[in-house]
Amino acid sequence: MRRTARIMLVLLGIGLILFIALSGLFEDYLWYSDLGYSQLFWTPLISKGIIQIINGTILFTFIAGTLFSIRHAILTFVNERLRKRLRLVHEMDRPLYHLSQRKMTLWLIIISVLISFGVSFVTGFTGWLEVLTFLNATPFGQGDPIFFKDLGFYVFQLPFFITIYNAFFGPLFFLTFFTIVFYSFAGVIHFQSLLIWKKQAIEINSAARRHLALLITVLFLFKGFGCYFDTFRLLYSQHGLVLGAGYADLHATLPALKALLVLCALGVIGGGLAFFKDEVRLLTLPILAIFISIPLLSGLGPMVLQSLVVIPNELEKETPYIQNEIALTRFAYGLDQISEEDYQADQPLTSETLQKELPTLNNVRLNDPHPLLRTYTQKQGIRPYYKFYNIDMDRYWINGEYRQVMLAPREFSYQDLEKTAQTFVNLRFKYTHGFGVVASFANAVTPEGLPAFAIKDVPPTTDYQELQISQPRIYFGEMTHDWVVVNTDLKEFDYPEGKANAETRYEGKSGIKLTPFNRLMLSIKHGTLRFYLANEINSQSRILLHRNIMDRVEKLAPFLQYDDNPYLVVDEGRLKWIIDAYTVSKTFPYSSMYPERELNYIRNSVKVVVDAYDGTVDFFAVDAQDPILQTYRKIFPGVFKDLSAMPDTLQTHLRYPETLFKIQSTMLKNFHMTDPTVFYNKEDTWDIAKELFGSEPQNIAPYYSVMRLPDSEQPESVLMIPFTPSSNANNIRTNMVAWLAARMDGEHYGELILYKVPKNTEVDGPLQVESRIDQDPEISRQLALWDQKGSSVIRGDLVVLPLAGNFLYVEPIYLQSEKAGSIPEMKRVIVAYGDKIVMSETFEEALAQLFGVRLKLSPPPPANVSALAVSPMSAELKPEETEETTEETEEPVDPQEDTQALLKQIEQIREMLNQLEQQFKKITGDSVDVEGGKKADEDAHDVQTDPEGSVSSEQSKTNP
């Protein structure tokens, strides 16, 4: 009975462990199925299971075979010794015969199963993707320059073969070594001499010899397998000058690998003969030969050739291989698709050219993202638990104008709740989502130096139809790290509203239903009984898991790499995240490695869209020609939709990804040089242009801009970055030599253009402009005056703006009090052109000082939503709220009468300004060119409606 009870307890424990493990799998299955991607759950799971079974079976064969062979060899050895000592004649007289019976066999099988499937369980999860890509490989249609194999062989097949080799060679080597050591200690192998090439050096019985012969034969077979594929791995070589196979690799290492392959073949033959013939040297001599040959052939030989032949004539010997590295690296990073154009950079900017470039000037980014984030937090945080994670740049057509917009979602920060409010009910049932977004125009600043909001407040309000939000709730974002339960008996907190709080219920379709069985499995998975004890949970309740959008997509498709900067867009009233996903490889031949991400091939093949409200995820194939994506589409049919399935309204918001652009810019520093001689001599290496951050120089980050490219008629959204020559401590060069632009609108999406400054033209780089700003006596005096105790000066990012064959440099200056909770205010704008630098209160004034012309830059677009129109959110107001609103607006207001009265006042002010201007001219004898015409002040004082909803006149100042 006791034995039966123990067995039952053991079985119960095993069952409990399996049940706990399966609870996690069950939760994953429910989650994948809820999103409609069950094949992303089943395909990897089944693949891993099959691989583990195959891997475990093969390892079991090796281990069990070895253990049984060791047992047989030792028993044979001991029985022979005992028979001699006891003088037993009959062959059936075996003193240790009983040891070979059932109990030992059972224990050997148990040990073999535990070791083999234990190792398989640990390693079997890692190789599933290599197996599936091997079975579904897509050719690149281009061969490598050495072995002429399709490039897909190196991306798909070779990693699979290397995985197989690594999975079995190590365990085989260990088993062989363990067997030799065990036989030696057991006395089965007796070394008569260390000179193992002699005939009588080793004494071994026949059973042990046959066992070792079999192990060594298989080991040589695998080593030969490895040597063969090592020849192709030479195209990843990092020895010598070239990344990839160089002269020494192909003329020394490759022959050495072929020689080792021959030795392995001889080892296989020798092992086979030793199995039948009592000659130990058939085993020892091949082992000795290969141990001596590996360091001599693979190490010393290439080193000698490199030193004596290659280095004295390095350029001559390595030129064809340098060309291979340049060509394939450029292909791997998409640099071969960059079109190059000359950018003269010496064309004078006139009033006519500036007038033509108004669309570009109207979108100059004056609001710097870093101070803007603080401003959003202080002005639009509303409550301490609302946080803005970062600022997203995008563009919208607003009232017929193409405008750059800076936008940040208002997410819920659980750690900023009062400690006493961080209860289970609040964290899981009550506070479930963020609310709305804040947006402002990139170039619009109020007279107080604050951003002009395009979307603001809670609930979100806007004057623009294109930015109307009908569903502002953010259940899935960048700061939503924990699960929540929705549709409980407890209403969810929606947003703060007066003395009370607005409440809501989740109406999305996603979420796992909390059925009794699901609650049981989730309780086991999360180690809590609250799924049963909480009275708020009912039959309609759902649990929302993996709400962080990056965790969400990485769990769905871990075989893709993702951009670090997802961005939110307003799409037909809903908030949607767009995440750039990459297909990558680190086994692309002859391609230089990008170390920060361990890759040497990358394509932005996929755009992922996540709905911020219900968490639905869609994968769209934007580069359907990419062979890696084509392979994934074979493995996971139906997961990746065609780009044509993406709504047109979303396609207009697709951006060229910043991470990919950084990678390409980094690689372009060297690989813009396509001539092997120039590349070898490093004659024209570049650096990313630098700017000052505090007092230290740092690389300029790529930035989005709406501008008109050279030879283009219309403004468009581009991502750009400037380059300067490479510098060192002895030779510091910071002039600009080129700038790279990525187009992203319409049919031009993804086009890369490299604009090169002629070598005989000297153009200031950003760091030079920063130095000139510091050296300007008036500017430096004013900044030093402000940057005293009680306040601090914040210098925004320096924006380099290519403009009509020249460059304009713009840097906003912010002033912030040192008091807690203070808001950075933009007080000045520094603009540089040629050898001139000015600092003014506004961008318009700075341009007027530089060029003597006052341009009529567009303010924020006029409102196109009636102030009396019902917003989408107002339909959700409670009856009492509606009554209050009605009472407040009982008295009718005629906007036209108000506007006419204001226009009369503006006209009076205009007359006063004209009189002052005439007096000024009489005193100075100077003339002011106002757009070259008579109606400068009229243009400068056009009436506009600002984002705050009030009517104001644009303040403009005359250039003294």
Curated annotation (Swiss-Prot):
The chain crosses the membrane at residues 7-27, 50-70, 105-125, 169-189, 212-232, 256-276, 285-305. Residues 931-944 have a biased composition (Basic and acidic residues). Residues 881-897 have a biased composition (Acidic residues). It is a multi-pass membrane protein. The keyword tRNA processing does not apply. It is found in: Cell membrane. The keyword Membrane applies. Keywords: Cell membrane, Membrane, Transmembrane, Transmembrane helix. InterPro entries: UPF0182. Belongs to the UPF0182 family. This is UPF0182 protein DSY1630. It comes from Desulfitobacterium hafniense (strain Y51).
